[in-house]
Amino acid sequence: MKETVRTYGRMELAQVYFPAILPRSAWKKLKALLMDNPQTASLAVLSRRTFLPTEVSVIFSVLGVP
């Protein structure tokens, strides 16, 4: 399934990458993946709960489109 670049909640985006697990666990896995890459590490520690389209675009380019 091709996802579009738009604003995503962090749990929502995590569920896109890991649909078979609970949202909280999916977020922990996505956060770990984001922390492993210097381009996306700052996104993992944001205090807000949404990713803007530009941030989603960076995540998709680094991790691949789910």
Predicted ranges, named:
Residues 1-2, 52:
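Generic detector of short alpha-helix boundary/capping microenvironments
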Residues 2-21:
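Polyanion-binding surface elements
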Residues 19-53:
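Major-groove DNA-recognition helix of helix-turn-helix-type DNA-binding domains
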Residues 53-66:
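A short, Lys/Arg-enriched interface patch at domain edges and termini
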